């Protein structure tokens, strides 16, 4: 292990088997100025409308979902990347089993 960087070879392996009707999350990186959280959603699960006090980036790495950002609805799938400024209302609804990274920073 090198103290100058952190490596995860396979993000999917970082999320164990998803129980039915659940959302799991795991903080995979945290520093003074940044936090990265890996989420796993069972199909049909959602994070209801909320805001963040930080800048936030949602990066979908597996599956399909609907992201509502402000008044816009986005059909998202693997590879979708969304940046949001602080205090912008947003929600995420999984249309299939879905994994996403959430980056939070000032």
Sequence positions of predicted segments:
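A short, N-terminal "cap"/entry segment at the start of jelly-roll beta-barrel domains
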Residues: 1-33, 68
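Conserved short histidine dyad/triad with adjacent acidic residue
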Residues: 22, 32-52
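A cytosolic small-molecule/anion-sensing beta-strand core signal
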Residues: 32, 61-62, 77-78, 96
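Glycine- and acidic-residue-biased ligand/ion/polar-headgroup-sensing regions
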Residues: 54-66, 70
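Short acidic-glycine-tyrosine-enriched beta hairpin
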Residues: 71-86
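Ligand-binding loop in jelly-roll beta-barrel domains
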Residues: 86-106
């Amino acid at each position: 292990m090198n103290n100058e960087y952190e490596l995860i070879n396979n993000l999917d392996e970082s999320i164990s088997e998803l129980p039915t009707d659940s959302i799991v999350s795991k903080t995979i990186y945290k520093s003074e100025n940044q936090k990265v959280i890996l989420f796993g959603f069972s199909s049909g699960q959602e994070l209801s409308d909320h805001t963040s006090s930080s800048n936030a980036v949602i990066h979908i790495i597996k599956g399909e979902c609907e992201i509502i950002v402000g008044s816009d609805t986005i059909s998202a799938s693997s590879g979708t990347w969304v940046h949001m400024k602080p205090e912008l209302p947003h929600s995420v609804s999984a249309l299939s089993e879905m994994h996403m990274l959430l980056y939070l920073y000032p």
